[in-house]
Amino acid sequence: MQNTSGLQMTTLNDILDMRNRAKYATDTGTKMHKKLQHVVIDNGIEQGDATLISQIKNNPEILRFFNRAAKTEVPLAGVVSGKFVSRRIDRLCIDDKHKHIDIIDYKTDVNRDAFYALYVAQVREYVMLLGMIYPEYKIDAYILWTHDFSLEKIGLK
């Protein structure tokens, strides 16, 4: 809404609407994370939400991250760029035999651009922290966009 001087005005209803949308987005993301946390698809075993299992099975690129060896909601803390950070990795796959780690961070946003820079920075922090723990391992990081189950590899430079 604009006032008579042409300035944009925000009404209480606008503020409440934005707050409700943010709460809805947060609640939706939390529910999706909890559902994905329990999904396992490995050697004939299927555990978790049937709809999610179906979506994951239809995408071989994603399927490999949902085996029994994958860890979920993994706490991680350390110092990055002189600042203490405490994080939680959504899905972590460590292959000790090949010295390789995959990090998967779930994002429920439909508009990828809104917080993209923050998401990339967050994933890069995971990589830096894990790199301190596993300096001899190759680490790949991904964002799994849950609205369309697309997987995006994050560049680490």
Q: PLM ranges: what are they?
A:
Residues 83-157:
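Mg2+/Mn2+-dependent nuclease catalytic core
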